[in-house]
Curated annotation (Swiss-Prot):
The protein's name in its UniProt record: Shikimate kinase
Residues that hold ATP according to the record: G22, S23, G24, K25, S26, T27, R128
Signal peptide: none
GO cellular component: cytosol
Known catalytic reactions: shikimate + ATP = 3-phosphoshikimate + ADP + H(+)
Annotated family: Belongs to the shikimate kinase family.
């Protein structure tokens, strides 16, 4: 249970959810925002709005670098506000410039077991441009390995090793945030 007086300890900063595609950032982000009484934004959805097409189309027509530029632009705009929960794209951690925005808030890494992410993503791999390879599972595991050191820079790590309902995951995230708040918000 999230109490309003505890939320005040966040001092109006944003909560950035980071982690691999399929980790549940968008699903749990809206519920976390509702409980915190913050607004929720999903950078992928905003990139689609700014880019005027789906992420898959943006990748196909303009390439990954263009997509990452749009992602940075969206993140820069969101970081000028406070009291937001922001579900970020899985690769947002790759650009040092993005960390300059992420560090203005509290970053929470949803560290989901690789097998669990694969189980989720294989239901609909066509929506994931970076998995359009002959061996999408190997591509996923390679991406996870490459990105883990970046994700590990998060202020809070929430290990997820089995399917968890969104309300349970929100509680798990909140407990991890509370523990981090006891140590002080990073600056």
């Amino acid at each position: 249970m999230i109490h309003p007086e505890e939320v005040e300890r966040l001092r109006g900063v944003n909560v950035y959810l980071i982690g691999m595609m399929g980790s549940g950032k968008s699903t749990v982000g809206s519920e976390l925002a509702a409980q915190l009484r913050f607004q929720f934004f999903d950078t992928d959805g905003l990139v689609e709005q700014v880019g005027g097409s789906s992420i898959a189309q943006i990748f196909a027509e303009h390439g990954e670098a263009y997509f990452r530029d749009l992602e940075t632009q969206v993140l820069a705009q969101l970081s000028s506000y406070t009291r937001l929960v922001i579900a970020t794209g899985g690769g947002i951690v790759l650009r040092p410039k993005n960390w300059s925005y992420l560090h203005h808030g509290l970053t929470v890494w949803l560290d989901v077991a690789p097998e669990l992410i694969w189980q989720r993503l294989k239901r609909d791999p066509g929506q994931r441009p970076l998995l359009q390879t002959p061996d999408p599972q190997a591509a996923l595991y390679k991406l996870m390995q490459e990105r883990e050191p970046f994700y590990a820079q998060a202020d809070v790590r929430v290990p997820i090793r089995s399917e968890t309902s969104p309300p349970q995951l929100v509680e798990q995230i909140w407990q991890a945030i509370r523990a981090r708040l006891r140590d002080g918000i990073p600056s």
